[in-house]
C-alpha cells in the first residue's frame, strides 16, 4: 500500500496500492498504475477494487477503462474473504491491459486539437443530456476546465498535453479531482472516485477517444 485514508467522517476507508506498472508519454509525462480499494466500516457498501491510473505531475486519477469490460470496479461482499489474486484477475490487471490503456493515452497525446474542437469537447462533457431536448450546460465548470487546458493546469504545458486530446482529458480530471466546488475536500474526493465526478471523468475519456476514432 502506498497511501490510505478515510472519507465521510471515517465511515468509508480507502487505500491505494501500486501494481508496479507505469507508462511514459512525451515530455517525461509519467502515469502509474494502482488498485484503489474502498470499504465502509458500517457495512453500507461492499469492498470495491478499481484499476486506477495516477498522472505523476498533477496527481490526477482516472479509472483504467478495460476493453471488453462492463465495469471498472470489482465488488467483494462483506461476508466473503478478500482474495487479492481473484480480484486482480477480475479487474483484468495484466501487462496487456495496462499497455492497451497507455497506448490509448499515447494516441490522445498525438492528436492535435483545434480551438473549436476543444470548445465542443468541453460542451459535450459538461452538458447534461439526461433530459429530453437540449441539455443544460454547466458554464462555470466548462470555463474552469477550459482555462486548465489552456495553460493553468498542472502539466498543461508538457508536450503530451499542450494542444492535444490528452490535454483535454487532463483538464477534466484535474478539475474533478482538485478544482470542483464541494463542501469539503473529502466530498470532492468521494465524488471523483465513486460518484458523479467519476462519471464525468468516464464521459471525458469516451469523448476524447471519439476524437481519435
Give the role of each language-model region:
Residues 5, 10, 20-213:
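Intrinsically disordered, low-complexity regions enriched in serine/threonine
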Residues 1-2:
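Charge-rich, low-complexity N-terminal segments
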Residues 15:
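A cross-family detector of function-defining hotspots
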Amino acid at each position: 500500500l502506498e497511501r490510505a485514508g478515510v472519507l465521510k467522517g471515517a465511515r468509508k476507508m480507502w487505500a491505494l496500492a501500486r501494481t508496479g506498472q507505469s507508462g511514459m508519454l512525451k515530455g517525461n509525462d509519467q502515469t502509474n498504475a494502482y488498485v484503489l480499494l474502498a470499504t465502509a466500516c458500517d457495512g453500507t457498501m461492499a469492498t470495491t477494487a478499481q484499476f486506477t491510473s495516477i498522472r505523476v505531475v498533477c496527481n490526477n486519477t482516472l479509472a483504467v477503462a478495460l476493453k471488453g469490460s462492463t465495469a471498472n470496479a470489482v465488488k467483494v461482499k462483506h461476508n466473503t474473504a478478500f482474495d487479492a489474486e481473484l480480484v486482480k484477475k477480475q479487474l483484468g490487471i495484466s501487462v496487456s491491459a495496462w499497455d492497451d490503456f497507455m497506448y490509448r493515452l499515447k494516441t490522445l497525446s498525438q492528436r492535435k486539437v483545434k480551438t473549436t474542437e476543444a470548445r465542443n469537447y468541453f460542451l459535450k462533457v459538461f452538458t447534461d443530456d439526461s433530459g429530453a431536448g437540449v441539455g443544460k450546460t454547466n458554464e462555470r465548470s466548462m470555463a474552469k476546465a477550459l482555462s486548465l487546458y489552456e495553460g493553468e493546469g498542472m502539466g498543461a504545458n508538457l508536450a503530451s498535453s499542450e494542444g492535444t486530446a490528452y490535454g483535454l482529458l487532463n483538464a477534466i480530471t484535474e478539475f474533478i479531482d482538485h478544482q470542483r466546488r464541494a463542501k469539503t475536500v473529502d466530498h470532492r474526493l468521494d465524488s471523483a472516485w465513486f460518484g458523479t465526478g467519476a462519471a464525468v471523468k468516464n464521459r471525458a475519456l469516451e469523448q476524447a477517444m471519439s476524437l481519435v476514432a
